[in-house]
Design a protein with these regions (language model features):
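Flexible coil/turn and secondary-structure edge motifs
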Residues: 2, 21-203
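Bacterial N-terminal signal peptides
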Residues: 6-19
Length: 203
């Protein structure tokens, strides 16, 4: 094969490979989803069980105060919700699958708190990062509404992300397992989730 033919062949090969390589390079290795469903201890625990989730970070989102403390958020005065940033591998688990997991771990009919925890800081919400997440979240909510599974309205908010403040007690369910189990059982979370979603709900 002549040198000219070799060069032409190599250029053709690179041209064929480049679009796929560029697409792979443009796709982020990890992505983030943010969910609120009451106490972030429980939400963190629930998503850590999902295959493809790499990290969960509990904190506060959706309020008006910059870098609020736990005590400020707990007062309900800042407008924040307890939320969890979920870092995941989209090659293993899709955003739609994370939404499916979210719905099975939230009371979608209670907009003033979740389970035994009351107040706007415990309100359920899906915080979206882009138009694709927004559409998928809205579609998932509409699917539940259209299913007529519940007589009451689905009140989970779908909001754009805002500043996120990490909480002071990450991995509480790991560092304080006995206290966490007593809290979760006493709050009636899993009992209510099974009432809403059957065996798929809760732990």
């Amino acid at each position: 094969m002549s040198r000219t033919i070799k060069i032409v062949t190599l250029f053709a090969l690179f041209a064929w490979l480049s679009p796929a390589s560029a697409a792979d390079a443009a796709k982020p290795a990890t992505q983030i989803a943010t969910f609120a469903a009451g106490c972030y201890w429980c939400v963190e625990s629930d998503f850590d069980r999902v295959k493809g989730v790499l990290e969960t970070t509990p904190g506060f989102m959706g309020g008006k105060t910059e870098k609020p403390t736990y005590e400020e958020v707990s007062s309900g005065a800042t407008g924040h919700a307890e939320a969890v940033n979920v870092t995941y591998d989209p090659a293993v688990v899709s955003y739609k699958e994370l939404l499916d997991a979210y719905w099975l771990n939230v009371d979608p009919l209670d907009g003033t708190g979740q389970f035994c925890d009351r107040g706007s800081q415990y309100r359920p919400a899906i915080f979206v990062y882009n138009d694709e997440q927004k559409k998928l979240a809205e579609d998932s909510k509409k699917a539940i509404e259209d299913s007529k599974k519940f007589k009451e309205p689905v009140v989970v908010e779908i909001n754009a992300v805002s500043a996120f403040t990490p909480a002071p007690d990450p991995d509480f369910y790991k560092t304080n397992p006995i206290r966490y189990k007593f809290y979760r059982a006493g709050c009636g979370r899993d009992a209510r989730l099974k009432q809403l979603w059957g065996d798929k709900g809760g732990h």
